[in-house]
Amino acid sequence: MIFDKGNVEDFDKELWDAIHAEEERQEHHIELIASENMVSKAVMAAQGSVLTNKYAEGYPGNRYYGGTECVDIVETLAIERAKKLFGAAFANVQAHSGSQANAAAYMALIEAGDTVLGMDLAAGGHLTHGSPVNFSGKTYHFVGYSVDADTEMLNYEAILEQAKAVQPKLIVAGASAYSRSIDFEKFRAIADHVGAYLMVDMAHIAGLVAAGVHPSPVPYAHIVTSTTHKTLRGPRGGLILTNDEALAKKINSAVFPGLQGGPLEHVIAAKAVAFKEALDPAFKDYAQAIIDNTAAMAAVFAQDDRFRLISGGTDNHVFLVDVTKVIANGKLAQILLDEVNITLNKNAIPFETLSPFKTSGIRIGCAAITSRGMGVKESQTIAHLIIKALVNHNQTVILEEVRQEVRQLTDAFPLYKK
């Protein structure tokens, strides 16, 4: 019987070897991709539970299948915890991803072809904020706003003038590569001025918002979307919040039956665990440590004139660095750092001159190393290791030194092998 084959290692060695290799990679690499984090064993246990067997189209108390009384409890727990965590009146926890959450929000707020003002991808926005290769750019008429050419920060007066000119039905705030705090109150004032809805995609900063170390968009936005991983440290999935009952009904209809069929109740259970973890007072200390670590790491680059720190600093979990004075492009920097077991990604910088497949910059985030227990001292050490590798990118002996120093650091802060 299939139920006898419960051990992946014995039943499917080829797959197990790949999983084990990834476990080893995570243990012995320094993870600096800003959209990644390390979940607790409790989150993984919930996601690997028998809930994966259950179909539950619909919502708690109103399902299309029988036998849903247990998953109703699970989903209700997730909903109520999300509402409490973010101070929202309504929450939808069924969206499979942040992109699905954004798609549902658009469906709830606007019609195909409507004009939307969103952050340009090159300035730090996300694909779902209007990229022409994404469903958002294909379905709606997106106009991109950028950052100030001198400060590389959002210029709210300029965004207001742009909004007056294009008269959008919706304004999208939020980013995937913007290192500064966003003033959601100003964005709402801009939206009100032109009669537009305001949607905030807080996927990257959700954990910081939950902990109260970053301003919350919930009091200002008509709809807030998020992922549940990244700084929130939960499973990969989406979340939608609102304080408007009428919009909540539209959101629910947009998610199901508009975009999805059966929800992933095992993932929703893992979301519920993550929300409970984030409600613990210790999570605020964790979120503050992310900000402290990121600031400390960024400061090392700011003090080295061979690198340029975009916008001059960071207020959150992420920052961008122009590396073109020491290496040809961000892609080569990413590849080189992978070789010394430091994982990050190439990233376009504002007013980018290189191809998006090469880029002038790299993006660095500190959520994952903070989850391992690393602090300011380790963050500074990692910055120096990155600089050492990039500056000496043709020196095999020095690169091996960096690799060994990375191993010493990861051994000192084990992930799951404690």
UniProtKB/Swiss-Prot annotation:
Pathway: One-carbon metabolism; tetrahydrofolate interconversion; Amino-acid biosynthesis; glycine biosynthesis; glycine from L-serine: step 1/1. It comes from the Bacteria. Keywords: Amino-acid biosynthesis, Cytoplasm, One-carbon metabolism, Pyridoxal phosphate, Transferase. InterPro entries: PyrdxlP-dep_Trfase, PyrdxlP-dep_Trfase_major, PyrdxlP-dep_Trfase_small, Ser_HO-MeTrfase, Ser_HO-MeTrfase-like, Ser_HO-MeTrfase_PLP_BS, SHMT-like_dom. Its cofactor is pyridoxal 5'-phosphate. GO terms for cellular component: cytosol. GO terms for biological process: glycine biosynthetic process from serine; tetrahydrofolate interconversion. PROSITE patterns: SHMT (PS00096). It is an enzyme of class 2 (transferase). This is Serine hydroxymethyltransferase. It comes from Streptococcus pyogenes serotype M6 (strain ATCC BAA-946 / MGAS10394).
